[in-house]
């Protein structure tokens, strides 16, 4: 069985833990509990193959900036999350999370961009609250622009409350992992030489 280590990053309260719990257990957690560091392991069948997904949840709060990168070792891919109703979390995708990952991994670990809470994008009360701060929800097109900016291999929006695209986030991640393994194999084959 193939093991895949996925680390989920993003600002606090954007729904990272809720996304992991909803995927692993099918339940929506109602209470917000700030995460320091947690991990889940779940078995998942995808395209008739079993995967052991190591899902590593990280703290988004600034207090854990020095602790968080310790969990980045041996990561197969990163999911960077922002909330579509939290514009600062979107800005931090590049300013904080992309920069931190590149600084501490220094490698070509694939990135998946995830826009959370998209069920609230058209919610009247949410839009009014954002308007009071002279802000608006992040559009899908803005998400696509950020995907290009950080070189993410995939971009998905989801809603844990409605369940929309929760599985798709992780299926996209598995596809990206599969593609990366093929690239690595081809690269190794290319670099093999035979001396006669």
From Swiss-Prot:
Motif (Effector region): 32-40
Keyword Membrane applies: yes
GO biological process, one term: mitotic cytokinesis
UniProt main location, coarse: membrane
Keywords linked to the UniProt accession: Cell membrane, GTP-binding, Lipoprotein, Membrane, Methylation, Nucleotide-binding, Prenylation
Matching CDD domains: Rho (cd00157)
GO cellular component assignments: cell projection; cytoplasmic vesicle; cytoskeleton; plasma membrane
Lipid anchor positions (S-geranylgeranyl cysteine): 193
GO molecular function, one term: GTP binding
SUPFAM superfamilies xrefs: P-loop containing nucleoside triphosphate hydrolases (SSF52540)
Membrane topology summary: Lipid-anchor
Record's keyword annotation contains Disulfide bond: no
SMART domains in the cross-refs: RAB (SM00175), RAS (SM00173), RHO (SM00174)
Modified residues (Cysteine methyl ester): 193
Residue positions assigned to the propeptide: 194-196
Binding locations of GTP: 10-17, 57-61, 116-119
Source taxon at top rank: Eukaryota
Compartments in which it is found: Cell membrane
Protein family: Belongs to the small GTPase superfamily. Rho family.
Protein name, as recorded: Rho-related protein racL
Record gene name: racL
